[in-house]
């Protein structure tokens, strides 16, 4: 058994850790983006309705 090669369980542990970190990272980004998108959509809709109302006068 070569000294360079790590044990199999260690490799699996690292892979699982990496997977968890990536999943958390992606989930956080998506959540933040969703919140900002919703906020911007609400602001945009409000400004559009106001603009439409002003145009109708």
Swiss-Prot record:
It comes from Mumps virus (strain Enders) (MuV). It is found in: Virion membrane; Host cell membrane. Belongs to the rubulavirus small hydrophobic protein family. InterPro entries: SH. One of its GO terms (cellular component) is host cell plasma membrane. The gene is SH. Residues 1-8 are virion surface. Interacts with host TNFRSF1A, RIPK1 and IRAK1; these interactions interfere with host NF-kappa-B activation at the level of receptor complexes. Interacts with host protein UBQLN4. It is a single-pass membrane protein. This is Small hydrophobic protein. The keyword RNA-binding does not apply. Plays a role in the inhibition of the host NF-kappa-B pathway. This inhibition occurs at the receptor level, by preventing the signaling of TNFR1 as well as IL-1R and TLR3. GO terms for biological process: symbiont-mediated suppression of host NF-kappaB cascade. The chain crosses the membrane at residues 9-29.
């Amino acid at each position: 058994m070569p000294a360079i090669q790590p044990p199999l369980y260690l490799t699996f542990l690292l892979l699982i850790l990496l997977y968890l970190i990536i999943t958390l990272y992606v989930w956080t980004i998506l959540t933040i983006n969703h919140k900002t998108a919703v906020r911007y959509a609400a602001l945009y809709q409000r400004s559009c309705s106001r603009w439409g109302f002003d145009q109708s006068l």
